[in-house]
Amino acid sequence: GGTNDVDINAPEMWEQINTFYLSVSRAKEFSLKLDHLHDFFSQIRNGSNQFIGVTDSTMSRDEGWHFARMGRMIERADKTSRIVDMKYFILLPKSYDVGTPIDNIQWSALLSSASGFHMYKQKYGTIDPIYVAKFLILDHNFPRAVHYCLLKAEESLHKISGAPVGTF
């Protein structure tokens, strides 16, 4: 395509998409029983991560790459905010459960679901709900933190628009 097209030009990207598609298509031939769901979702997560890796290692840092990164960062920020929201309003709706072992287990699971358990433990050590929320929402270095994602989306938006930083 032309310079304004958002294309998938790298054969490695097409190969990864095709492999992922075939893998997911084969899954519908099998019944997705509860004991197989973990493997199925791990396969989806790994396929997505592999595509992101191939994309980042093969695409020029042009408008198409920035557009894809901006979308990925907005989706990631949305996912993380939904995870935190779910913990506050669904998993532990009773205030007297706050600080109990089940609360701490849920916060640990929340970190794991955002692929942040080990990074959190390196930074803060023990599980503390305030620090977990701070880490997942405000951290500048964790790639799934809402703030980090929005900073990267804004960087790409500036690259795409050509507008100087601080103008919107």
Model-derived regions: residue spans:
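Alpha-helical transmembrane segments and their helix-helix packing motifs
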Residues: 1-168
